[in-house]
């Protein structure tokens, strides 16, 4: 007996479907271009590439579990990165020795996470206390966060960090890329949070039926605030990874990641109406998307065509899901009484 | 039989309807003659709504034959049915509150005339004709939202007449009406019948409309269990046919003398909903609160649990003030609330049965770092499900797979696991089958025997009489009457409710 939501055997779960898809995309790309796709260099470069948007997808996942969404993740990531970058350039600078620069790096990371938490608190308050629809609240706040980042930088990139900063995004630990380790830890943490804690169960139940959560005396405002704060902090973590990999911070980095993060969460089986979502599904969806993306790169598909493909894929996946688990969705949207 | 069928306006034969394995209707024959008034009686879940949906073309039947207006209707949808003269007036009337009376009455007619331009004078004329037909005067230009309930119903009837209705189906027509308004409605029904318009009353409280009806049809569990001239039925025999048992339930045993006051409500008021609410609830007492639809009973129930913030007044439990307008404060003060609408307010339908119970006890079972002690939590929830005799083959299955009665017990289990001091039950047996209903009543009696204060809010008078020690009657947001549960009959209570 488990506390794991809907009961189904693994082979019939959406996660199993995703495993098949991920494997299929991998095999397909390997067959198309075996020497390039399967090369060690390509595999390593993929492992460095995906964690940044994968972490954004985790942020998207937890908000979608409540039936909400966070469109401000990229804005939060950039604002946090800009603040961290300003600390690192103004107070530390590129010449600084390793020892003291590590202290400043720690300080910059803490500041970035605080910015993420504060941004999440703003989003959560808009949703919980003012009752704004999350999609509009975070669309607006995302523009505000981006605007703040532009105001701080004048729109240009901030660069000139101590050498230690590059470590986060570009080094490997025991052969595993650091960003990948970071993503692994965050994904595991989110998985445990959602499945093993009282908070996680409240998030799922709130997503399944917000009104019933209110009637069951769940403190729904607190749940929403926490969810958006966690999403904000995940977004700022992604911002730090982006900053380290680019060795700079700018207000408009990663703008294509927003759609990608939404796509991954939906592809990962997270119910955009709330109440269902598993981190393992999101991880598998991330892998599929990275394989696909690298493959398209090697086939020299243009960036514009890629955005088009992402958009089509997002709609396609949602249509598929609505047929497969559609009954559940519509039963909640308008309960049918039989008598 | 076939001879009757020749002239009948509605002639259904052997109607069977199955939803995903559940048989909602099972071989039902049903006829309505022109100008005839028929009572369609049955408890919630008996299949009467399904039958109406089939006649009005909303649901397709699984087996059987439908004739409307003397023609076979192998294909039926709401448009065809309406064109044949079948009009349904739902309980909420489906009017446009922001439009005027005449616009509401003439709207459908004007649409179906397929003219591109809207003719205001024509619309007013249509509306006036319809009102004249039932002999009622209502200002044509008033917005519908400002009308009292009884007038809204009349507007709905006129809309049906304006669309050339030959059969008007009225869903729960009297639940929101006072006795005087019911009498006027009956007068109008008589006029309609003289005009050759047939009427079907759908209700679980039919005593009021028996006198204008020719025929009564009773459904139970999807089958027709009784049919006959209305003169052969009375309240008691209807209840017998609807429930399938002679059932004076055992009334509650007396509250032990000297029981202490559990809950105290002083001067609770909310603009537009209720005012001057004062009562005390003793340990082990079951307090019934009743009133017509719109009397403020549900708003009051929600206010007691903090879901509606009252403008003034106080609520005390065990002598301590409870912050109003905050369900979490109410919950921690020991108040539990089982809502009226299980499907939207009570349950997390897609989630497992065990989770639906455990959500009430997360604080108790979360250890260090907020991690849940899952096995203890599941064990406790399973224990409560067993105590309340929830029939579930698998407690990890989604709660939507359960029947209404079992679902209600899941909500009850959630609250009972929190050991509440006061439990508020709003419509505890709405949409549950007869057997479960009796079980829920016996659970209520057990709870009061354990010293829990129970508030039952319901418009089901036999239910209140079977469970409550005291009954408060509400009208227009005020408590107008207080009666001891064992001192009144159902008729007296109904009279006090609607006089």
Please place each PLM-identified region on the residue numbering.
Chain A
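Inter-helical junctions in multi-pass inner-membrane proteins, predominant
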Residues: 35-45, 92, 150, 156, ...
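Transmembrane helix-bundle core of multi-pass membrane transporters
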Residues: 130, 134-196, 223-226, 245-254, ...
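Single transmembrane alpha-helix segments in multi-pass membrane proteins
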Residues: 26-31, 39-94, 125-132, 266-276, ...
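Helix-loop-helix "hairpin" substructures at the membrane interface of multi-pass membrane proteins
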Residues: 104-112, 118-123, 175-249
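Transmembrane alpha-helical segments in multi-pass inner-membrane proteins
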Residues: 235, 246-311
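Membrane-interfacial amphipathic/re-entrant helices at transmembrane-helix boundaries
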Residues: 1-57, 92-107, 335-338
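Cytosolic-side transmembrane-helix boundaries in multi-pass membrane proteins
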Residues: 1-27, 215, 219-222, 292-339
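Alpha-helical transmembrane segments within multi-pass membrane transporters and channels
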Residues: 92-142, 284-285
